[in-house]
């Protein structure tokens, strides 16, 4: 790198310049050197050692004063060092950004005042330099001098420049000092940004092919019908009056016979390809595919490329500094705008944190209740249903009373300590012990009776307690859950049994949607002889889904259930080592080894089958499914690269703190991350070390979730408990929590028409246009800051990546 390029990089260093500021009598912070200039103009003696650059005439000093009032410290220093004097003269000559003289100056001429007024009337010119180029890379940024600082500088308040509700106090990018750097960047910087753009393009390709983008999902189209219909609103926003309505629970309204079941699709068929993935083709034409899904080889080539980029030293340093900059920018924003945010929030009628919509974006269904609730339920069944036959064990049917007598327990003996389902210190870094906590009193038979959908009583008890939890959710009105429910891939009829459990027991609510979790347990099934190869699991998981997509009448209950399913999750202990025994991974039908396939292999076969399925479902007008696996909780950070390519969002993601380049990519693409600090605290990472607050400050798309209330929560409202602990430990403001609640709704899989009611009719638009503060209680100023910061980062990527394309074209 030559000396000029090095100097340009040093000029744009993110290191803060030394501060030489003091408070004046009004409490405002001003620059000492600029104050001296103002004193000199007023006739006050100035130190003879004042640098020549600061001995400016009245026009120059005023221009510098006005800018310094709105610039951050290091940008102010940078501006002075790179020719403020010449800049002010240029702007004066071109009449592009002339400000009024301070009232205390005795050398102010009437021509200068007229020029200043002309400058105020052309606000667009005021935001440009003498070359006509914008001062900030983001066209949407509104950097207007705050009224208090205008008064201090002596400039009158002009109505045309009154700050809007979405503008915020912030330093501007001094492009006069960096324009040459932007126009002639170093080759290293071009290469780094080109790699970022390449990775983003790869993700866009995989997401588009698999129809995982929100705007591709038919359920987000205007004509989609939700059945049972969502509750009628009890408030008319037009007349601002309360409307008396009576909304019945969905379980009472739902009638399976009223559900529309379409007929067979004669145009398309499905079969297995060479990679043992299901593909969809024209009937009778196996070579005419509905979509070209990336092969296993293509996927691993792309994965290796991304891993190589993310582990490159300069790329890691670059991403780390960008993330540090984002965090520092947040700290400055929060320092200057905290009270304005609070003021807007207080003026918003009716809304506060408790009555904005929030979604528990990651919670396992079998652990959706707390211990006290489960204990009361077990005691109730022992009192009222003790003679009911509940399990077939040891060659005979046992009643509930006989089961507890075999355990030498009565209802009176039961307590929270007896259940022993809470994750205490002994589960830290012991996922095997944590899994045992799903067994009440350590007995698998009680888990089978009370916490399974597929048992002798057909999951009746689990349906009953789930309805009680749902009743609490519906009463709270503003809390919603996305429950993970298991399909193991051990047999072809699992999907039909699960769908029958949901439909027959009417476990249906407008507060609940489902994700199907796939445990990575091939090695156990292989050892017990349930499956012969990995292909058996893939077949059991996906063949019923392709069958019901081709002909919904072949599995009518499954078709109705899938309308309430958002997508797939992949679960298990990530800390297990992925040993690579093959130079080239075999396809599933040839994977007969006893070892479990690696995480990346599991994820690809979930992705490839879901991609073909989604293409077909979208063509038929059915809702599509997304991939939202557990990822980055423990184990190899490379799991996060696989998920970045293939998944719509992830759960946990705490290992992103170790891979800054991948974390930067997650920020740029706003990949949804459902974080559970209380869960991490019990298993893998103590609460104080959790990266959640840093992710939030930097602008990653994070939400809070409970994971397993049965193991981690003590109250009847585990989601509120999660928020409250985070607010206390991380000192989150009310606006912060409302922003997290809004994030959770955006990440969730509810239909667009429901999200419009929850967070605003234009929620899918970018920036302030997509925010409805009346519904979200998030001030426009916060949304504008988030959008402006992200836009600037994306524009930087596009700006510098274009240089490489231009060079290659030449």
Swiss-Prot record:
Catalysed reactions, semicolon-separated: AMP + H2O + H(+) = IMP + NH4(+)
Keywords carried by this UniProt record: Hydrolase, Metal-binding, Nucleotide metabolism, Phosphoprotein, Zinc
Modified-residue entries (Phosphoserine), positions: 19, 58, 61, 138
Active-site residue list: 652
Cross-referenced InterPro entries: A/AMP_deam_AS, AMPD, Metal_Hydrolase
The enzyme's E.C. designation: 3.5.4.6
Pathway noted in the entry: Purine metabolism; IMP biosynthesis via salvage pathway; IMP from AMP: step 1/1
GO cellular component, as recorded: cytoplasm; cytosol
Record-linked Gene3D superfamilies: 4.10.800.20, Metal-dependent hydrolases (3.20.20.140)
Record carries keyword Cell inner membrane: no
Cofactor(s) listed: Zn(2+)
Residues the entry annotates as binding Zn(2+): 362, 364, 630, 707
Record field: compositional bias (Polar residues): 1-10, 125-137
Enzyme class, UniProt record, top EC level: hydrolase
Domain of life: Eukaryota
One Pfam family in the UniProt entry: AMP_deaminase
Quaternary data: Homotetramer.
Family of this protein: Belongs to the metallo-dependent hydrolases superfamily. Adenosine and AMP deaminases family.
PANTHER family: AMP DEAMINASE (PTHR11359:SF0)
Any further remark recorded for this protein: Present with 3910 molecules/cell in log phase SD medium.
Record's protein name: AMP deaminase
Organism: Saccharomyces cerevisiae (strain ATCC 204508 / S288c)
């Amino acid at each position: 790198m030559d000396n000029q390029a090095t100097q340009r990089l040093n000029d744009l260093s993110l290191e803060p310049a030394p501060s030489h500021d003091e408070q004046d009598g009004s409490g405002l912070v001003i620059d000492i050197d600029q104050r001296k200039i103002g004193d000199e103009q007023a006739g006050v003696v100035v130190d003879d050692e004042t640098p020549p650059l600061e001995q400016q005439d009245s026009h120059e000093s005023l221009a510098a004063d006005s800018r310094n009032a709105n610039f951050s410290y290091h940008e102010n220093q940078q501006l002075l060092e790179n020719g403020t004097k010449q800049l002010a003269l240029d702007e004066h000559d071109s009449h592009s950004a002339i400000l009024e003289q301070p009232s205390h100056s005795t050398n102010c001429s009437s021509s200068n005042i007229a020029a200043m007024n002309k400058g105020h009337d052309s606000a667009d010119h005021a935001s440009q330099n003498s070359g006509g180029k914008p001062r900030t890379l983001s066209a949407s940024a509104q950097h207007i001098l705050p009224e208090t600082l205008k008064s201090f500088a002596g400039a009158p308040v002009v109505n045309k420049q009154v700050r809007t509700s979405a503008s915020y106090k912030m330093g501007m990018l001094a492009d006069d000092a960096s324009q040459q750097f932007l126009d002639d960047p170093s080759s290293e910087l071009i290469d780094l940004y080109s790699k970022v753009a390449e990775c983003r393009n790869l993700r866009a390709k995989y997401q588009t092919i698999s129809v995982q983008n929100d705007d591709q999902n038919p359920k987000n189209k205007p004509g989609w019908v939700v059945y049972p219909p969502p509750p009628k609103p009890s408030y008319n926003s037009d007349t601002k009056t309360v409307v008396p309505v009576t909304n019945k629970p969905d379980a009472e309204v739902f009638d399976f016979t009223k559900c529309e079941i379409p007929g067979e699709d004669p145009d398309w068929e499905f079969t297995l390809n060479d990679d043992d993935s299901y593909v969809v083709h024209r009937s009778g034409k196996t070579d005419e595919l509905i979509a070209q899904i990336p092969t296993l080889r293509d996927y691993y080539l792309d994965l290796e490329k991304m891993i190589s980029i993310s582990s490159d030293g300069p790329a890691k340093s670059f991403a780390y500094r960008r993330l540090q900059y984002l965090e520092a920018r947040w700290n400055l924003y929060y320092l200057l705008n905290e009270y304005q945010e609070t003021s807007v929030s207080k003026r918003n009628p009716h809304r506060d944190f408790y009555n904005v919509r929030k979604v528990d974006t990651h919670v396992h269904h079998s652990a959706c209740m707390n211990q006290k609730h489960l204990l009361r339920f077990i005691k109730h069944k022992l009192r009222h249903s003790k003679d009911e036959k509940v399990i077939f064990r040891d060659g005979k049917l046992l009643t509930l009373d006989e089961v507890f007598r075999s355990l030498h327990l009565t209802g009176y003996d039961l307590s929270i300590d007896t259940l022993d389902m809470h994750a205490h210190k002994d589960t830290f870094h012991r996922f095997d012990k944590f899994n045992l906590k799903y067994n009440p009193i350590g007995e698998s038979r009680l888990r089978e009776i009370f916490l399974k959908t597929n048992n002798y009583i057909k999951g009746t008890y689990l349906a009953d307690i789930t309805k009680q939890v749902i009743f609490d959710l519906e009463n709270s009105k503003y809390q919603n859950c996305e429950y993970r429910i298991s399909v193991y891939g051990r047999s072809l009829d699992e999907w039909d049994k699960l769908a029958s459990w949901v439909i027959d027991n009417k476990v249906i609510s407008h507060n609940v949607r489902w994700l199907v979790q796939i445990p990575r347990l091939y090695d156990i099934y292989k050892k017990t002889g349930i499956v012969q190869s990995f292909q058996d699991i893939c077949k059991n998981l996906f063949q019923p889904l392709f069958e019901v997509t081709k002909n919904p009448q072949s599995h009518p209950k499954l078709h109705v259930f899938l309308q309430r399913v958002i997508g797939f999750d992949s679960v298990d202990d990530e800390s297990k080592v992925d040993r690579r025994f093959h130079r080239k991974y075999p396809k599933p039908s040839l994977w007969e080894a006893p070892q479990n396939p690696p995480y990346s292999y599991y994820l690809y076969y979930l992705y490839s089958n879901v991609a073909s399925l989604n293409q077909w479902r979208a063509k038929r007008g059915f809702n599509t499914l997304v991939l939202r696996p557990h990822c980055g909780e423990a184990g190899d950070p490379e799991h996060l690269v696989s998920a970045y390519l293939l998944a719509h969002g992830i759960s946990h993601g705490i290992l992103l703190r170790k891979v800054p380049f991948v974390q930067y990519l997650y920020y740029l693409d706003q990949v949804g991350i459902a974080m559970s600090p209380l869960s991490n605290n019990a298993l893998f990472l103590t609460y104080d070390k959790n990266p959640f607050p840093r992710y939030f400050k930097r602008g990653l798309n994070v939400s809070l979730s409970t994971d397993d209330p049965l193991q981690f929560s003590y109250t009847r409202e585990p989601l509120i408990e999660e928020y409250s602990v985070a607010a206390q430990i991380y000192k989150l403001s009310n606006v912060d929590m409302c922003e997290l609640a809004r994030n959770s709704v955006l990440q969730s899989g509810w239909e667009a028409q429901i999200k419009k009611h929850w967070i605003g009719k234009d929620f899918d638009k970018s920036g302030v246009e997509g925010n409805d503060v009346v519904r979200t209680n998030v001030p426009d100023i916060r949304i504008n800051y988030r959008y402006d910061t992200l836009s600037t980062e994306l524009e930087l990527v596009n700006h510098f990546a274009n240089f490489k394309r231009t060079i290659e074209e030449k």
